[in-house]
Regions:
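N-terminal loops that bind phosphate or other acidic moieties
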Residues: 1-157
């Protein structure tokens, strides 16, 4: 209720429509305040990062994009790094392979959001706390298998 009241006051004072501003309520309304009083433009964080590192230019020479996340689930579709990477790469026609610690229910939603495939590095059905110490070995094993799959699909070994 407090943020709504503040938003209404800011809208009256500035004449700007802020109540429907995507991302305006994040960080206690900081985004809306910056738009209202400083004329700022809000952007998704992943878009700012990908633009800064020249992601679109790098895609022009890429055969694949690999991305990762500790746990991929339905929430991963809504604004997480992996969904931003998948959307940009898919728009450029570059397949995206996600390598994750845990592919939880809902992870399949990213397959409709630009992701080509998802591989979990966990080789045993154990809680994270028990397999944490094996993550480096499991990641190497998963990446070796993915590389072999790509090589086999291309007709080489």
């Amino acid at each position: 209720a407090g943020l709504r009241s503040l938003c209404a006051v800011m809208e009256r004072k500035t004449g700007r429509g802020l109540s429907t501003l995507a991302g305006g309520g994040a960080a206690g309304g900081l985004g809306a305040g910056m738009v209202a009083f400083l004329g700022a433009e809000l952007r998704r964080g992943i878009d700012a990062v990908l633009d800064t590192v020249g992601f679109d230019e790098a895609l022009q020479q890429a055969d694949f994009v690999f991305t990762g996340e500790g746990r991929m689930d339905a929430q991963s579709v809504r604004g997480k790094v992996i969904s931003g990477v998948a959307a940009r790469a898919a728009a450029a026609g570059v397949p995206v392979i996600a390598v994750v610690g845990d592919a939880a229910p809902g992870a399949e939603l990213l397959l409709d959001a630009g992701l080509c495939s998802v591989f979990s590095i966990n080789r045993r059905p154990l809680p994270f706390e028990q397999v944490r110490g094996e993550s480096d070995v499991n990641l190497r094993f998963a990446m070796k298998n993915i590389a072999r799959l790509i090589a086999a699909a291309r007709g080489s070994r």
